[in-house]
From Swiss-Prot:
It catalyses: 3 propionate 3-nitronate + 3 O2 + H2O = 3 3-oxopropanoate + 2 nitrate + nitrite + H2O2 + 3 H(+). Nitronate monooxygenase that uses molecular oxygen to catalyze the oxidative denitrification of alkyl nitronates. Acts on propionate 3-nitronate (P3N), the presumed physiological substrate. Probably functions in the detoxification of P3N, a metabolic poison produced by plants and fungi as a defense mechanism. SUPFAM superfamilies: Inosine monophosphate dehydrogenase (IMPDH). This is Probable nitronate monooxygenase. Its cofactor is FMN. It holds the Pfam family NMO. Signal peptide: none annotated. Belongs to the nitronate monooxygenase family. NMO class I subfamily.
Length: 357
């Protein structure tokens, strides 16, 4: 069976399909439905307060008895200067004025928020905990493993995958450059540039260098992508954009429609929205902010500075001023219920296997 392997056994799920964290766009209904249909639904908790995370976990637990996960951002510890913030506030002033917004106060509480989230995951016995932007400390990994929680890391290079395995991750997601949303990169490359290795190149190279199960992410939207990923050596897939446009997704309708009506040439990788590289649909804000390249405050500072602009723009229909995360396969996105998407994915793989045989 294409779905019976080390990955599905480790996660105690039927199908090797993981719904990506998609911070800010997941709902309890989305997560629970994916899990109820045999995949692994994940709460995108990167921006959650402890109270919000507790509420979401309880909602999901009330909707499913199947395994699910919580996706967390590992604190980045990036330094920044007050001058950077002052300059960015000056550059963002026209947007705030147009949207009638006040200048925000930067409040960095990443570390405290992350540690609190870990304790919440343990308290509520969440079966799986996923990480991006790095690897948590040895102490945190030991705490989670002591609670019998399965750990999933993220890698955009072979070295990052090896680091995840050495740290004690049970599974690693190989995130190709096609993936929508934030890049999970955390190790510096020889040329000091953000690694942008495509899924087809990344998967087999990571598979050859680690012994833990590898999950393919980036551009996977249907049964063809699932089967192709397995042929490359991945034991499963992580899908974001495919779930982003479903009825149960918490993404703004403006974003959903933008993805559904975009082409493969419409996405770019930019750090202007959050201070960390992410793939999304190009727009006026990205083009305007390009002139400040090299002067963007790091995540999470830039994320806080642009947060109210992005949220207000999205809620008032200003698609040119908000982030619209999407992978490179928007033409394959569909608007349907999650259970329909899951059924379609499974049927597509079955049909393809019949043809191949």
């Amino acid at each position: 069976m294409w779905y019976n392997n080390q990955l599905t056994q480790s996660l105690n799920i039927q199908y090797p399909i993981i719904q990506a964290g998609m911070a800010g766009s997941t709902t309890a209904e989305l997560v629970a439905t994916v899990s109820n249909k045999g995949g692994l639904g994940c709460i995108g908790a990167g921006y959650f307060t402890t109270k919000k995370l507790e509420q979401e976990i309880q909602k999901v637990q009330g909707l499913t008895s199947q395994p699910f996960g919580v996706n967390l951002f590992v604190p980045s510890h990036q330094s920044y200067t007050n001058e950077q913030v002052e300059h960015m506030n000056a550059w963002l002033k026209p947007y705030r004025k147009a949207l009638n917004l006040e200048e925000p106060v930067v409040n960095i509480s990443e570390e405290q928020q992350f540690k609190s989230a870990i304790q919440t995951v343990i308290k509520y016995r969440v079966p799986v905990c996923c990480f991006t932007f790095g690897i948590p400390s040895k102490e945190i990994i030991e705490q989670l493993k002591g609670a019998k929680i399965t750990l999933i890391g993220t890698a955009t290079t072979v070295d990052e995958a090896i680091a995840n395995e050495h740290a004690g991750m049970d599974i690693v997601v190989a995130q190709g450059s096609e993936a929508g949303g934030h890049r999970g990169s955390f190790l510096t490359t020889n040329n000091q540039r953000e690694p942008l290795i495509g899924t087809m190149s990344l998967i087999p190279q990571i598979v050859d260098h680690v012994s833990i199960p590898v999950v393919a992410a980036g551009g996977v939207m249907d049964g063809r992508g699932i089967l192709a990923s397995q042929i490359l050596g991945a034991q499963g897939v992580q899908m974001g954009t495919a779930f982003l446009t479903t009825e149960e997704s918490g993404a703004n309708q403006l974003v959903k429609q933008a993805v559904l009506h975009s082409k493969e040439t419409d996405t770019i990788v930019t750090d202007v929205f959050s201070g960390k590289s992410a793939r999304g649909i190009n727009n006026e804000f990205v083009e305007t902010m390009k002139q400040y390249e090299g002067n963007i405050p790091p995540y999470p500072v830039q994320n806080q500075l642009t947060n109210s602009i992005r949220k207000t723009a999205a809620s008032t229909g200003h698609r040119e001023w908000t982030h619209m995360w999407s992978g490179q396969s928007p033409r394959l996105a569909t608007s349907q219920h999650v259970n329909q998407l899951m059924d379609r994915l499974v049927e597509q793989v079955k049909t393809l296997l019949t043809v191949v045989r």
